[in-house]
């Protein structure tokens, strides 16, 4: 294996504080003018989901749209869920009809749910089995390094009544791809995301399971709002016809084999399915969130009640929740890279002044306790779209009584 030098000369003049705005460079296709959503304070620097196996250092990103009213697509998606734009009774009827069409009673699986045993995958699998009478197989792409509570939640998921296949990739290859993804893309989570998106359709084809259900559509978090108009997931996320233009960790398959001496067999697990194979097996990949009125904190409460879900002992780095991104010990590093690249942190789509003020007071206290200057970290605090803000807003809009202290 050849050495891969990382030292790069930096022209610090590009980053001088007195450069006129029109002369500043924008990278990765991110908008030059930074704009914040009027409701959730997420910026237009948030990239949309991409086809990970096409991701290189030169990739140009499409980013979250902030519409003419100053409100982002994610917030508009939230409004559509809450204000009657969606007939949820009709959506549930569609789901029941879909399940009736594919339900098997011969002892075989009729749907597949990928996940870690976190709140969303637990909620999805449990609903499908115990509400809709389906027979799901669950599959898990292992995190880089399990946290104790991540592993316990995985076991709780299984013991709530689900068969599970845990896929743990070759440690040597996984470490290499994680390092390359960090050095080339500053994206340490890419090897995990590759498996997260591609394992389920592969397993469905292998077992002849026609339906795959993910939870929320990424349009909930800022992808184009039009994506919410269909229950089907864009197959380009997990299937290709051409393997000649695939990159892992920002490196081509050919370079991985020739320069890094990685065997093809050790890379196969990361590769997307062949489109023809999925078509031959009639595999459909759908979002359960299209049919169910998905709410993250509601999924958390559900998983606690029905499966003993255990939150992390401390809040996820840079957020106010203890149940998001808690399975992997490198989650915190990934969150930091997101902030550094795109001035963003864990997503959410709602805000009210009163709730924000109360949260900021608590956030300031925690920053001070950790020895940070709150003034310096003000931008970080403003950029964080906290889970509990959206959850509190959801409750308030629904006319329910809930104290902010009980939510955060």
Question: Language-model segments: which ranges?
Answer:
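Nucleotide-activated chemistry modules centered on ATP-dependent adenylation/adenylyltransferase
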Residues: 1-111, 127-371, 381-384
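Short, glycine-rich nucleotide/cofactor-binding loops
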Residues: 111-120
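Residue-level micro-sites within transmembrane alpha helices that shape
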Residues: 119, 386-387
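Hydrophobic positions on the alpha1 helix immediately C-terminal to the Walker A/P-loop
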Residues: 123-124
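N-terminal regions of proteins, emphasizing targeting and processing segments when present
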Residues: 359, 363, 388-393, 399, ...
């Amino acid at each position: 294996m050849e050495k891969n030098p990382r030292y790069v000369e930096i022209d610090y003049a590009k980053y001088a504080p007195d450069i006129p705005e029109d002369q500043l460079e924008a990278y990765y296709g991110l908008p030059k003018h930074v704009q914040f959503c009027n409701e959730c304070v997420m910026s237009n620097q948030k990239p949309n989901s991409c086809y990970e196996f096409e991701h290189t250092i030169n990739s140009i990103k499409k980013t979250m749209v902030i519409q003419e009213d100053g409100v982002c697509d994610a917030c508009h998606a939230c409004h559509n869920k809450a204000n009657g734009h969606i007939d949820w009774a009709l959506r549930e009827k569609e789901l029941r009809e879909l399940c009736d069409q594919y339900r098997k009673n011969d002892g075989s699986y009729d749907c597949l749910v990928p996940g870690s045993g976190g709140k969303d995958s637990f909620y999805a699998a449990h609903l499908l089995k115990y509400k809709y009478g389906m027979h799901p197989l669950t599959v898990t792409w292992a995190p880089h390094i399990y946290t104790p509570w991540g592993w316990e939640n995985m076991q709780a998921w299984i013991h709530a009544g689900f068969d599970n296949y845990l896929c743990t990739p070759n440690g040597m290859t996984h470490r290499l791809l994680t390092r390359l993804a960090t050095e080339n893309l500053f994206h340490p989570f890419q090897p995990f995301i590759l498996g997260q998106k591609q394992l389920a359709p592969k397993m469905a084809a292998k077992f002849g399971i026609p339906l795959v259900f993910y939870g929320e559509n990424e349009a909930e978090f800022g992808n184009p709002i039009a994506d919410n108009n269909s229950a089907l997931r864009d197959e380009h996320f997990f299937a290709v016809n051409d393997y000649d233009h695939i990159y892992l960790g920002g490196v081509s398959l050919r370079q991985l084999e020739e320069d890094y001496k990685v065997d093809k067999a050790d890379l196969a697990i990361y590769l997307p399915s062949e489109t023809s194979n999925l078509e031959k097996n009639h595999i459909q990949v759908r979002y359960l969130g299209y049919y169910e009125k998905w709410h993250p904190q509601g999924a958390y409460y559900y998983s606690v009640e029905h499966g003993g879900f255990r939150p992390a002992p401390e809040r996820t780095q840079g957020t106010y929740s203890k149940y998001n991104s808690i399975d992997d010990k490198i989650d915190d590093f990934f969150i930091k890279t997101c902030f550094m690249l795109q001035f963003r942190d864990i997503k959410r789509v709602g805000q009210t002044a009163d709730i924000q003020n109360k949260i900021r007071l608590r956030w300031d206290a925690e920053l001070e306790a950790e020895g940070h200057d709150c003034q310096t970290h003000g931008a970080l605090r403003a950029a964080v779209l906290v889970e509990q803000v959206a959850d509190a807003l959801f409750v308030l809009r629904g006319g329910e009584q809930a104290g902010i202290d009980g939510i955060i």
